[in-house]
Structures are given as structure tokens and as C-alpha cells.
Amino acid sequence: MDATFTAEQEEIRRTLRELLLKRCGPEEVRTAVQSEGGYDSALWETLAQQLGLPGLAFPEAYGGVGCSVTELALASEELGRSLAPSPLLATAVLSVPLLLAIGSEDQRAALLPRIASGELTAALAVPGASLTIALGLTGDNRGDWAGGGRAGGVQARRTDDGWRLYGQADQVLDGHSAGLLFVAAHTGGFARSRTLLFLLRSGSPGVTRVRLTSLDETRSQARVQLRDVEAELLGEEGESSDVAGVLASVGDSAAAVLAAEAVGAADRVLERTVEYVKQREQFGRAIGSFQAVKHRLADLYVQVQAARSAAYYAAWATAAGEERVGGLALAQALEALRITSSEAVQLHGGIGFTWEHEAHLYFKRAAGDELLFGPVHRLREHAADAARLFGGGEVAV
């Protein structure tokens, strides 16, 4: 593994950081999350058309940039620093890999160029509130998470002219605004029946989307209800796809990207805290000069840097097709962000507890992502089970 960034990777980081410093400060973030889409559409257009972010990690033949998960992780690290609300996670990290892995050539040719241009955003809808299980991050994703029929969840029924979907999906990231939904559904009325993926276009009759109130407002979520909805199968009819295996692979790469994003957030909130303790005075001196405060900040720095190393390695391993360590990296990064943001609130004193200050936004990102993709101990437990560290049986990953 070469840990040195290429000139192209450094340019991605530098350009994004400069842009976000100008256009995505705390006030811009608050304004964006209150908008109908939950993000700044003008900023998203710039990220797509000038920087090529949505298509960063897919082939140039479909309008992408042709980079890898590593570059996507570096870009997400910069977005995490500013907590920039955007459809990048739902579209480029969770949805595009499914289209590349399972979609037919016609589907890829029709949809990927529109995604690359920023014209089309996408979201992954899995039944109930089981995103972390569906992605294989905290357990075996070949179980009954998708429900189906009397088991609940989302059911797909074959008809003479195609497929029909029934059911409900929660925790759908950017599901209220996405122009394209990737829906996981069971094809039978029992818990372990076959799972397939389907495409739903914007405006499909029978689809109800409700934006949910979430702990982390920068990570928009929606509930998607399906009532006799006509759907298009992802991939070719008659082909057998290992949907659970593909979802687990996507989950690992998504975890690596999310880990980098969390590291970016932790790094930024630590920077802001260091700046503040150099200015705030008690007993006639800056509180940052007290040894107890220095030690707390030093511990945070070590934790953030360790998480960064884990995130970078996970991104590299994913891009190189090596071992799956995204879940472990995500656990370390989420823990680092939670501890760092919590300490930031404390070290800022009274102002750190106010709504106007940005510290609570970082704490909510940590807590919200643990609810969506964790918790940390479950991520580590599953990684240990998969590696059979404690003599357990074989676990599918």
C-alpha cells in the first residue's frame, strides 16, 4: 500500500475544501437543511458539473470520472468537515454501485450519465428500518430483514406485464427528493424468500414519500410507502443476481466512505475547539494553557488520527479488492467523532450548549450515524464474528 496521495487526489481535497469554505459555512448549512430538498441545489450543481463528484467513482464510458472509492472517500472527508448536506451518499455511494453491479447495459447507459451530470439523484430504499442489516454491517444480510407478505417489509409480485410492489421502507436517505429509487423487495410471502432490486422513477403512481424529522438534520431521511406500484426490475429478466452479496459489498465500501466523512467532521470540530481554547480566558489566562485541557485535546488528536488511518486503509482496501474492513474503520471513526464532538461541547463552555453554535451539529451527526449505520459495538461484533476471532461459525460478509 502506498500511503502517499497522488497529485490528483490532493487537488480533489484542495478544490473541495476551498469551495466549501466559501459556500458551506454553518449558516449556509442551516439554510440548506430547511429547504424543500434538504440541501443546497446550486451547490450540488457546482459539485456535479464543475467537480464531477456524483460520477467520481464510475467509468468514463458512462460520463463518470473513472476514479475509485479512495477518491470518493477523500471527497467525503471534505464534505464531512463542513457537514455539507448533499445527495452524494445516497446517490454515488449507496445507489450507483448497485446499478453498476446488477443493472443491465441499457439501464446503465440511460441512468449513469444523468447521475454524473447531477441532473438525477438516487436513493436506496430497504424495508422497515433495517439499513445497517441490509448492508451487512451489523449482521448477516441473508436473513429476514426484507420481510415480505405477511412478514411485513416490501413484497414484489409478478404480473403479466411486469412487477408490482407493496410495503414500506423507512430511513431512506434523501428519499423524499431522489428522482430514482432502488427498492429491495421480497418475491414471496415468507421471511426468507428471494430478494430482488427494483427501480422506481419519480412520479410513479402509488408511491407516497414523507420526509421524516431526524436527529441529524444534515442527513435527510424519508418514509416511502408503496401501494400496487409498477416497478422495473434492476438487471435483466431471468438473470440470477446475488442481491445480498452485492448489498454487503456496497455496505463495506459505503462504510469506508462514511468513515472518511466522520474523520473529516471530527478533525474540523477538533480544530474549532483548539481555536476556541486559545481565546477563552479563565483566571487570567487562556484555558488552552492548562495542562488538563492540553491532555484532553492531545487524546482527541490521537483518536482522530488513528481513525483517519483506519478510514484511509479501508478505502484503499476496497479500491484494491482486498479485505473488507469498512465496518471496523467506520466503528473507529464514529467513536472518534462522538467523543470529539462531545468534548467540543464541554470545552466550549456555556456557548457550546446553545442552538446558535455549530458544536451540537457535529454531535448530532455522530449520534445520527450511529443510529443509521451502527452502533459501534455491533459493527465491531460483526467484524469479530466474520473473522471468527472467538471460535464462532462462518459468517457471510
Tell what function each PLM region has.
Residues V154-A156:
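A structural signal for short hydrophobic beta-strand segments in well-ordered beta-sheet cores
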Residues S86-D106:
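N-terminal glycine-rich flavin-associated loop
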Residues G118-L137:
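A short, Trp-centered hydrophobic/proline-enriched beta-strand micro-motif
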Residues L120, R150-G152, S177-G179, S193-R194, ...:
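A generic structural signal for well-ordered coil/turn residues at beta-strand boundaries
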Residues G136-R142, Q171-V172, R201-E236:
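Flexible, small-/acidic-enriched active-site or ligand-binding loops
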Residues S86, E105-L112, T121-A123:
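Short secondary-structure capping/junction motifs at helix and strand boundaries
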Residues A125, Q168-V207:
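A short core secondary-structure module
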Residues M1-G80, I102-E105, R114, G118, ...:
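Alpha-helical interface subdomain recognition
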